[in-house]
A protein has these predicted regions:
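Short catalytic/signature loops enriched in Gly
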Residues: 9, 16-21, 160-164, 256-301
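A short, flexible loop at the N-terminus of ABC-type nucleotide-binding domains that lies
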Residues: 18-22, 31-44, 75-81, 98-102, ...
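P-loop NTP-binding/switch modules centered on Walker-like glycine-rich loops
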Residues: 60, 74, 195, 199, ...
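Conserved ABC transporter NBD signature motif
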Residues: 81-93
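Conserved ABC ATPase "signature" region
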Residues: 92-93, 145-164, 273-274
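Conserved ABC ATPase signature
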Residues: 168-173, 177
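A short, proline-enriched helix->beta-strand linker immediately N-terminal to the Walker B motif
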Residues: 188-192
Length: 301
């Protein structure tokens, strides 16, 4: 599929929903400067998100969705990275803050659940200690209080026999249990905005369903704003209020999630919808694939 120069399809119905604005992104660009040239990962993305709502960011691998989330959180580090535009969180432009100011926000007001819990958790440190250290760094609690809170969080994310598992190392847990620990750590300081970047990657279908339901439950109970990054439209169906569809670093469609599924307007979103496998399909029926290939981000037209 070639890069489309069609305008972004935007619905205004979700914009009128209640709640104050917690996040507003304006004309965000992120480029990586490589030996082969400038890789334009995010190109002029703008959107806003109301407090307590959930947003899905979907697109193929390489569409820029993860880079967008990391750019908002100021996590794209390196001398070869350039980010411009604005990302206002509770009225503060995150891109204008110093690293010290951002460190005060990371984990406390804004948190992220990463794709692979084996790389986001320290393999040499017991899981309970990792949550405890996170609490003690950002909250005025002693070790005993932090340990009890960590245990409560592990129980809350439904880790069986949390009392005995709190002293386990990450490799001693299954992939699903490790992701639950990552969620507990992200929720420890009660952030108002949570990014979940492909939180069910490499998990089996049953565990995926459990993790997604857990995130939805925590988001509702805490009245937390959540951004779910995924390549799978099935992940956001019935779980997010609004959706952005990204292609080649741009948002090509944004609307309420119900509208995305009921009356898709952009050809790329339609192609994504057609590519979803359905149980109603006859056996041996070829899967619908998106024709062509994504554009190379260093050689965009």
């Amino acid at each position: 599929m070639a890069v489309s120069e069609e305008p972004t399809y935007t619905s205004t119905s979700s914009e009128s929903m209640g709640g104050s604005e917690i996040l507003r992104v304006e004309d965000l660009h992120t480029s990586f400067f490589l030996p082969i040239g400038e890789l334009q990962a995010v190109r002029g993305v703008s959107f806003s998100l109301k407090r307590g709502r959930s947003l899905g960011i979907v697109g193929e691998s390489g569409s820029g969705k993860t880079v967008l989330a990391r750019s908002i959180m100021c996590l794209n580090l390196g001398s070869n990275v350039k980010t411009s535009g604005s990302a206002f969180f509770d009225g503060r432009d995150l891109l204008a803050l110093s690293r010290r100011e951002m460190r005060r926000l990371w984990g406390t007001e804004i948190a992220m659940i990463f794709q692979d819990p084996m790389t986001s958790l320290n393999p040499m440190v017991k899981i309970g200690r990792q949550v405890i250290e996170h609490l003690r760094q950002h909250k005025n609690v002693n070790r005993r209080e932090a340990k009890q809170t960590a245990l409560d969080l592990l129980n809350e994310v439904r880790i069986p026999e949390a009392e005995s598992r709190i002293d386990r190392l990450p490799h001693e847990l299954s992939g699903g249990m490790r992701q639950r620990v990552s969620i507990a750590s992200a929720l420890a300081c009660e952030p108002s905005l949570l990014f979940a970047d492909e939180p069910t990657t490499a998990l089996d279908v049953t565990v995926q369903h459990q993790i997604l339901n857990l995130l939805s439950r925590e988001q509702r109970q805490r009245n937390m704003t959540m951004v779910m990054v995924t390549h799978d439209l099935g992940v956001i169906a019935g779980r997010t209020d609004d959706t952005l569809v990204m292609y080649a670093g741009k948002v090509v469609e944004q609307a309420s999630t119900d509208e995305i599924f009921e009356k898709t307007q952009h050809p790329y979103t339609e192609a994504l919808m057609r590519s979803i496998p359905r149980t109603s399909q006859a056996s041996h029926t070829p899967l619908a694939a998106i024709t062509g290939r994504p554009p190379v981000a260093t050689h965009l037209p």
